[in-house]
From Swiss-Prot:
This is 4-hydroxythreonine-4-phosphate dehydrogenase. The gene is pdxA. The active site is located at the dimer interface. Its EC number is 1.1.1.262. HAMAP family: PdxA (MF_00536).
Length: 331
């Protein structure tokens, strides 16, 4: 294992939210890797004292070998906030700060300095209010690493759900599903299940778009015109695909027990099942990037900032999965 492969970068996200609290909570235990937090050191130290938790920071040095993180400490890649942070109060003045932390962490992950990037929650609305067009982390990282196509996947211990389309109005979904887009999404999904999850022959179950997967064309034509031909082409390339199946059929234990991943056609087709089954234990993963990226599955929880009641479970799960994916990639 290379030294830098033992180094993960973390972006706590929105400074007024629970992200800084969670970064400090992560620091309260030992980790087998070095955790480099891209944030304002003054923000973390102030929040740690508000939470009454011990925190020592050491400045990140790229030329030094990675060290396993000891409880009570974090390595810091510093970016300064523009205005004073009040826990629970959004300030448009710090939007550029948030984006700068993402850019710095992303560049380090692209260059291979960091083996993985783990993100805390950002407040999309306040970034956009600052005049910075921002759809989400996924799109930001894709753009910055010049990836034409990435895939959003959420995972729990028992279930992985990838999305054929992500943050689109429902009205725009059918037009966004083409044979070409399905080809790209499924190829990335299959490849990353092999390389980052260590699954030699992934079985991917695919949802139809319409109720009853179109009922043979009586309830929509997307399955017949687009989804089935795309799956047949991919099967000829050796990808193991089952479907399209009606989503309400597919999300039953008898099918899911054989699925390495489920491909849902749109955001709210696949994610409610997964969230119900594993909220707080789910991890958001971006597939198709030139680096490993995992994320918490919750928002900024402004009302919990600096209260000491924020749950670090999702962040720990996201970190542990990133470490597992690094190990799979190195094998």
């Amino acid at each position: 294992m290379h030294n830098h492969n033992n180094r993960l970068v973390i972006t706590p996200g929105e400074p007024a939210g629970v992200g800084p609290d969670l970064a400090i909570a992560l620091a309260q235990q030992d980790w087998p890797v070095e955790l480099v937090v891209c944030a304002d050191p003054a923000l973390l130290l102030a929040r740690a004292s508000q939470l009454n938790l011990p925190l020592q920071l050491r400045e990140y040095q790229a030329d030094q070998p990675a060290i396993a993180q000891q409880a009570g400490s974090l390595t810091i890649l510093p970016v300064k906030t523009a205005v004073n942070v009040v826990p629970g109060k959004l300030d448009v003045g710090n939007s550029h700060y948030v984006v700068e932390t993402l850019a710095k962490a992303c560049d380090g992950a692209i260059s291979g300095e960091f083996a993985a990037l783990v993100t805390g929650p950002v407040q999309k609305s306040i970034i956009n209010d600052a005049g910075i067009p921002f759809i989400g982390h996924t799109e930001f990282f894709a753009d910055r690493s010049h990836c034409q196509r990435v895939v959003m996947m959420l995972a729990t211990e028992e279930l992985r759900v990838a999305l054929a389309t992500t943050h689109l109005p429902l009205l725009a979904v059918p037009g966004a599903i083409t044979q070409a887009s399905l080809h790209e999404v499924i190829t990335i999904l299959d490849n990353d299940l092999k390389t980052k999850f260590g699954i030699t022959q992934p079985q991917i179950y695919v949802c139809g778009l319409n109720p009853h997967a179109g009922e043979g064309g009586h309830m929509g034509h997307e399955e017949i015109d687009t989804i089935i031909p795309a799956l047949n082409t991919l099967r000829q390339q050796g990808i193991n695909l089952i479907g399209p199946l009606p989503a309400d059929t597919l999300f039953q234990p008898k099918y899911l027990q054989h699925a390495d991943a489920v491909l849902a056609m749109y955001h709210d087709q696949g994610l409610p099942v997964l969230k119900y089954q594993g909220f707080g234990r789910a991890v958001n993963i971006t597939l198709g990037l030139p680096f490993i990226r995992t994320s918490v599955d919750h928002g900024t929880a402004l009302e919990l900032a600096a209260t000491g009641t924020a749950d670090v479970g999702s962040f720990i799960t996201a970190l542990n999965l990133a470490i597992k994916m690094i190990n799979n990639s190195n094998e």
